[in-house]
UniProtKB/Swiss-Prot annotation:
Its cofactor is Mg(2+). Residues 1-236 are annotated as: Pyrophosphorylase. The keyword Magnesium applies. It is an enzyme of class 2 (transferase). This is Bifunctional protein GlmU. Pathway: Nucleotide-sugar biosynthesis; UDP-N-acetyl-alpha-D-glucosamine biosynthesis; N-acetyl-alpha-D-glucosamine 1-phosphate from alpha-D-glucosamine 6-phosphate (route II): step 2/2; Nucleotide-sugar biosynthesis; UDP-N-acetyl-alpha-D-glucosamine biosynthesis; UDP-N-acetyl-alpha-D-glucosamine from N-acetyl-alpha-D-glucosamine 1-phosphate: step 1/1; Bacterial outer membrane biogenesis; LPS lipid A biosynthesis. SUPFAM superfamilies: Nucleotide-diphospho-sugar transferases (SSF53448), Trimeric LpxA-like enzymes (SSF51161). The lineage of its organism: Bacteria, Pseudomonadati, Pseudomonadota, Gammaproteobacteria, Candidatus Palibaumannia.
């Protein structure tokens, strides 16, 4: 626990010009989550580690949309402050000054730098001296576009923005990430001394570094553990590159703890994955939302799994889509199966090729092997659903339930017209349309009687001859 009063300022007022999109840059998705949400989540983690914390988001372009998309999740944590005119980072921070108390810590973050880690920020806060500031910097092989760190006798004396730097300064490889920790008392003084006497006519927050040095304040620098932590997003190419980098990092983290991934370059995790032992992911698997896997789970190529709980010894065959479902131990799904929200597959049940299940329970050891639609149904144990069976659950206005008992056999190409109850041990003949309840152990057949025609001959096509002269 840090015994400090912390103010986290997240700058998110940019117009996102280079994204060429009507959507604010910080609302674009990285691994399925808005870019800004990553920074907010990290800020909330810090909140739990400090004596008290306020989180301020400085917004501008389409700020109402930002609040609509994000604020509902953390209403009590976030304070939204509008920057009416975008006049640089110093001007953005100035909007927060009236809300800062005396002798408090201020941490500056950026809404378009999503992967900054909790550990790095804790390090940044703990290294700041009482009479100075801490600055997050990094050494890059290609520092183009970044402000450069200026030293004099091994002490940081300032930051020069790329567009203001001379040829010699542009050779400096240590760059400013923009992320810093500073005292509220000193920040208030230094912000008022900023000028916009530069090529962009903006108030640069980075100019407070030179002001701090001139006053003899100690300026600490630390580096992030990974360069990806400080990667900013300004255009679609940078977003795509960071997506691939982040996905590979997640895959490598899973590999290190024993999860087998056939190809880390073709694995996507857009959410949170909890898992047991002996997990195998084939290529091009997508995990979304909150997914939990038991032990001995195999997921075939091309599968999409979203907000689902999967038990032990489960096999998901290729190209299956599973969302908001529950799969019990020993179940098998696919290939080409679709489990929609509310599907519950019980122990050792089987869902096969081109089967769609929605808001239904498939009991223990029951099978729906081929080409079927099961919707709003409760199916018992040891049931066999033949190929092409459909639960007709919708009457054009309302959905109705189908209840099937234990040990029921449903023949192929049957239609079950809900609302409907089929008792234990019943048998439904192939091609039957069931319109009323079936009692236990009853056999139901409703199809046209077969009539044989003796000595019938199939019509033959006439042979046409083309004469070529």
């Amino acid at each position: 626990m840090l015994n400090i009063k912390l103010n986290i300022v997240i700058l998110a007022a940019g117009k996102s010009t280079r994204m060429n999109s009507d959507i604010p840059k910080v609302l674009h998705l990285l691994a399925g989550k808005p870019i800004l949400q990553y920074v907010i989540d990290t800020a909330i983690k810090l909140k739990a580690k400090c004596k008290s914390t306020n989180i301020y988001i400085v917004y501008g372009y389409k700020g109402e949309l930002l609040q609509q998309k994000l604020a509902h999740k953390q209403k009590t944590f976030l304070h939204w402050i509008k920057q009416v005119e975008q006049s640089g980072t110093g001007h953005a921070v100035q909007q927060v000054l009236p809300f800062l108390g005396k002798d408090e810590e201020v941490l500056i973050l950026y809404g378009d730098v999503p992967l900054i880690s909790f550990q790095t920020l804790i390090h940044l806060l703990t290294t700041r001296s009482k009479q100075g500031l801490s600055l997050l910097t990094a050494n890059l092989t290609n520092p183009d576009g970044y402000g450069r760190i200026l030293y004099k006798e091994q002490e940081v004396v300032g930051i020069i923005e790329h567009q203001e730097a001379n040829a010699q300064q542009k050779l400096i490889s240590e760059i400013n990430t923009g992320i810093l920790a500073v005292s509220s008392n000193e920040l208030k003084i230094w912000i008022t001394k900023l000028t916009n006497n530069n090529s962009m006519n903006e108030f640069y927050l980075t100019d407070i570094i030179a002001l701090a040095w001139q006053e003899g304040k100690k300026i600490h620098t630390i580096h992030p553990e990974k360069i990806s932590e400080i990667n900013g997003i300004n255009d679609c190419a940078q977003l795509a590159n960071l997506e691939r980098l982040y996905q590979k990092e997640q895959a490598e983290s899973l590999l290190r703890i024993g999860v087998i991934i056939a190809d880390p370059n073709r694995f996507d995790l857009r959410g949170e994955l909890k898992h047991g032992d002996n997990i195998f992911f084939d290529t091009n698997v997508l995990i979304e939302g909150q997914v939990s896997l038991g032990n001995q789970v195999t997921i075939g190529t091309g599968c999409i799994i979203k907000n689902t709980v999967i038990g032990d010894n489960v096999i998901i065959k290729p190209y299956s889509i599973i969302e908001e479902a529950h799969l019990a131990n020993g179940s098998i799904v696919g290939p080409f199966a679709h489990l929609r929200p509310g599907s519950k597959i019980e122990e050792n049940a089987y869902v096969g090729n081109f089967v769609e299940i929605k808001k239904s329970t498939l009991g223990k050891k029951s099978k729906v092997a081929h080409l079927s639609y099961i919707g709003d149904a409760n199916i018992g144990k040891d049931v066999n659903i033949g190929a092409g069976t459909i639960t007709c659950n919708y009457d054009g206005a309302n959905k109705h339930q189908t209840i099937i008992g234990d040990n029921v056999f449903i023949g192929s190409d049957s239609q079950l017209i809900a609302p409907l109850t089929i008792g234990d041990g019943a048998t439904i003949g192939a091609g039957t349309t069931v319109t009323s309840n079936v009692t236990s152990n009853e056999v139901i057949i409703s199809r046209i009687r077969q009539f044989p025609i003796i000595n019938w001959q199939r019509p033959k096509k006439k042979i046409r001859y083309n004469i070529i002269y």
